[in-house]
Amino acid sequence: MAKMMGPRFKMCRRLGLNVVGHPKAMKRADRGTSRADKKLSDYGIQLLEKQRLRAYYGVMERQFTRYVDQAFNSKEQPGEALLMILESRLDNMVYRMGFASSIRQARQMVNHGHFLVNGKKVNIPSFRLNIGDEVVLREKSRKTEMFVNNFKDSIGSEVPYISKEEDNFKGIFARKPKREEIPITIQEQLIVEFYSK
């Protein structure tokens, strides 16, 4: 399986966006260290925004391009459709539900088979959830203190399109998110323009 490699904090500073979720990722960022601080052409600005979004969700270029194609073929605005596709990935939902402290950690947990989706084991991070799907931490995985603490510590801080059942270690993709509810600072229209050329 292909992975995004390289120093993660350095990548955050270069992109001018905390794409790993770690509170110290941007700590050493000085003005002038990110591409966002440099004068860029319109193309450069669009490319940077695309790289930011791809890095945030940890998606490889080929897969990201497929998502873009799907977004352009949908009936919704391409930018918002792209965000919805990325947001509904299982690894991201595991993160949003509070089982993991980062999307990267969530991806590892999914790969290792720690979750059931609607009662069935799913170990594919890119698996797309539908509205109403339930994600449950497996019984044997509840013996891992870190997983349990992550979930319980996140109670009350989840995004509004997710509901949780603390006693059952369950998260539910309750409804389609509104754009303003997705907690990522990105200008998706720039990405649409990048792929419209």
From Swiss-Prot:
The keyword Ribosomal protein is assigned to this record: yes
Keyword rRNA-binding included in the entry's annotation: yes
Keyword annotations from UniProtKB, A to Z: Ribonucleoprotein, Ribosomal protein, RNA-binding, rRNA-binding
All residue ranges annotated as the S4 RNA-binding domain in the record: 88-150
Source species, domain of life: Bacteria
UniProt xrefs under SUPFAM superfamilies: Alpha-L RNA-binding motif
Listed GO biological process terms: ribosomal small subunit biogenesis; translation
Signal peptide: none
GO molecular function: rRNA binding; structural constituent of ribosome
GO CC, alphabetical: small ribosomal subunit
Family: Belongs to the universal ribosomal protein uS4 family.
Subunit structure: Part of the 30S ribosomal subunit. Contacts protein S5. The interaction surface between S4 and S5 is involved in control of translational fidelity.
Role summary: One of the primary rRNA binding proteins, it binds directly to 16S rRNA where it nucleates assembly of the body of the 30S subunit.
HAMAP family associated with the record: Ribosomal_uS4_B (MF_01306_B)
Record's protein name: Small ribosomal subunit protein uS4B
Organism encoding this protein: Clostridium perfringens (strain SM101 / Type A)
